[in-house]
């Protein structure tokens, strides 16, 4: 059994719905899961005590990538989270009309790799909430579970 932190930033509730579904699926896989809203989190040693971290954040922007307001400060301080040696996967909801559709996924993955985290599967990108593409959410959870 692994201890898994699911950290999310959500403005409209779409990313939160994905995080909640992932919490349900990962817990059903026999793992201890903590769901944490970025609005209630501090970057300092956030990953301590966890084997894996799933990070979800909505993003948008026509020219520059804009991360969700509560998640952006945590992203800026990711080096303080203690991610070195941790397993990590990223997920996002987005709107395909924006140039940076689900741009949080590659941004999180790139920064996490640079900090010594192991990105364990391809990130999940969904337009809308968890009910928009339940098969994609389930497949992502299965990929994560295989690597825990």
Swiss-Prot record:
Domain called Flavodoxin-like: residue spans: 4-145
Sequence intervals crossing the membrane: none
InterPro entries xref list: Flav_short, Flavodoxin, Flavodoxin/NO_synth, Flavodoxin_CS, Flavoprotein-like_sf
Entry keyword ATP-binding: no
Organism listed in the record: Desulfovibrio desulfuricans (strain ATCC 27774 / DSM 6949 / MB)
Function of the protein: Low-potential electron donor to a number of redox enzymes.
Family statement: Belongs to the flavodoxin family.
Alphabetically ordered keywords of this record: Electron transport, Flavoprotein, FMN, Transport
Single Gene Ontology MF annotation: FMN binding
Name of the protein this chain belongs to: Flavodoxin
Cofactor: FMN
Record PANTHER family: FLAVODOXIN 1, FLAVODOXIN 2
Domain of life: Bacteria
């Amino acid at each position: 059994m692994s201890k898994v932190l699911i950290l999310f930033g959500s403005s409209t509730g779409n990313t939160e719905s994905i995080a909640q579904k992932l919490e349900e699926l990962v817990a059903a896989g026999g793992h201890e899961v903590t769901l944490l809203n970025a609005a209630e989190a501090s970057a300092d040693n956030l990953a301590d005590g966890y084997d894996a971290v799933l990070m979800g954040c909505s993003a948008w922007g026509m020219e520059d990538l804009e991360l969700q307001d509560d998640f952006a400060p945590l992203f800026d301080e990711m080096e303080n989270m203690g991610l070195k040696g941790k397993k990590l996967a990223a997920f996002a909801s987005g709107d395909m009309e924006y140039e940076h559709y689900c741009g949080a996924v590659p941004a999180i993955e790139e920064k996490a790799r640079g900090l010594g985290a192991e990105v364990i599967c391809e990130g999940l990108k969904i337009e809308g909430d968890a009910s928009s593409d339940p098969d994609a959410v389930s497949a992502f959870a299965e990929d994560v579970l295989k690597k825990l």
